[in-house]
Amino acid sequence: MYKRQDIFVDFAEENFDDLTEERIEKYRNAPFRAPLIVVLVSTKKDHPKVPEMEQIISTGTAGQNIMLALSALGYGAIWRTGSFAFNNKISEKFGLNENQTIIGYIYIGTPAGKKKSLPEMNTDDYISIWD
């Protein structure tokens, strides 16, 4: 089993040609960016009524609910994916089997400073009314 800081570095060294020392350090420190990281793992199980995509979506929904609960408790959380999610080689380094996929990482901590204000979004860009 790997030490958590080695998983991402080993993967990067095996798969990226243009690695700098700075980038290697970034990957080495990734697991320490927050006091707690929840790794969201979707486990595919053959089921006649629940297709694989619904199983993955359900894991994502569980992750979103975790984030909502954390926010309600005053914690900060950010969901990250990137090269280290939906990646069989990373899943293997975590000791997962072929039916398991990492769909994301939730970094959890106590927010520092004021909450950033976000620009208002026009919901018409995302919602359609079907009459």
Range-by-range predicted roles:
Residues 38, 44-92:
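Small-aliphatic-rich amphipathic alpha-helix that forms the alpha element of a beta-alpha
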Residues 70, 94, 110-112:
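Short leucine-rich amphipathic alpha-helical surface patches
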Residues 102-131:
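C-terminal helix-cap and adjacent tail motif
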Residues 3-59:
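Glycine/small-residue-rich phosphate/adenosyl-binding loop
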Residues 29-32, 96-99, 119-121:
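Solvent-exposed alpha-helices and their adjacent loops that cap or buttress functional pockets
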